Swiss-Prot record:
Protein location: Secreted
Regions that span the bilayer: none
Modified residues (Pyrrolidone carboxylic acid): Q24
A GO molecular function held by the record: gonadotropin-releasing hormone receptor binding
Family: Belongs to the GnRH family.
Keywords from the named record: Amidation, Cleavage on pair of basic residues, Hormone, Pyrrolidone carboxylic acid, Secreted, Signal
Species of provenance: Dicentrarchus labrax (European seabass)
Gene Ontology, cellular component aspect: extracellular space
Protein name from the UniProt record: Progonadoliberin-2
UniProt modified residues of type Glycine amide: G33
Amino acid sequence: MCVSRLVLLFGLLLCVGAQLSNAQHWSHGWYPGGKRELDSFGTSEISEEIKLCEAGECSYLRPQRRSVLRNIILDALARELQKRK
């Protein structure tokens, strides 16, 4: 019983740590260090992104960490309550 709880706690910490880290992954068209191949985008698309960020509407760049962590905790609590019933 103790070992299974320890494994569950370790898995939960691993998931939360992965969500909270600022690790960079490679995506199509991106290179290490955040450099992007600009040939694949039109200049109008790039300028629109810059205009949106200058206007302060860059909320899509910020991850929603609180909601992810809250959902994980609520799911765990719901499972515990279901086990007790």
